[in-house]
């Protein structure tokens, strides 16, 4: 499952942001937090009690993934946004395709990522909090 992070007002990254400091990043709004929790509940309703949950290192993606409540969240660098580093688009998207192609675990895989990565992978635009089964 590809999931765009939940509602985080704005777009792109703030000037001078740091991955280790959420106070320098766009983060989920209260509506985004509620959205993430509601999506997690909906996944449970549809029989997904647990999953392998991977996230980019961006705080809005990590928090989205954590609030789903479907399992421990692991940071996967190939999921990191390339919004400010467009020359890496092709290589990073190829690596993401490889991750999906090589997935062999029986439990579902949930990827919490940014829009630019989703568009690079499948060529469509998901709204905040939208999920896509692949």
What does each model-found stretch correspond to?
Residues 91-93, 98:
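Internal catalytic-core helix/loop-beta-alpha segment
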Residues 98-134:
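Active-site-adjacent alpha-helix immediately C-terminal to a catalytic or transition-state-stabilizing loop
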